[in-house]
């Protein structure tokens, strides 16, 4: 949930999906109240210093026709919120200094300032609160090797575009730990600016990454 300066290996391509508890998503991501959802994504690292991703998050709301008229009052996952992400690492981690990265999620936003349509038109998604995940950040990461494992320290300054995400603005960060007896396992603790989350991920057979987390140390989200 919080950014870091870590990058995937050059040439890596990742596809995955996650279940997300409603406490994980922005407060404005709602339909008659907040709801659990899921996303799926594609991530590529064409060079060691840049990472690109495309994410789709299932969105529950009224079904509408091409003119924006409601044709079904029942709320289902008829729509998806889509956005691009980019991370650039101008400084690689060294022995005495951290890696530094800058990045953004949904930097292009929408065509209009009222939703997912042109200005002065009715938003096609009907809520006028899009750009749910739009944020910008600068992050630093440093790893420390010990006999018992590797400790990662991550810090970032992040700014969200929408006011309803302001609780996550400012300084955020976390720590990661990989034990020496299981280098493919990593435990995580982070502060998002508003809550503390814990989690873990595990790489199996060099290709399958399993991830799990507890938002506010209580609410489960996870995926591959």
Where are these regions (language model features)?
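Glycine-rich phosphate-binding "P-loop"
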Residues: 152-173, 181
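Charged, glycine-enriched surface loops/patches
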Residues: 108, 216-218
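Outer membrane beta-barrel transmembrane domains
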Residues: 169-178, 182-214, 221-224
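Transmembrane beta-barrel domains of Gram-negative outer membranes and organellar outer membranes
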Residues: 1-136, 141-147, 159, 179-185, ...
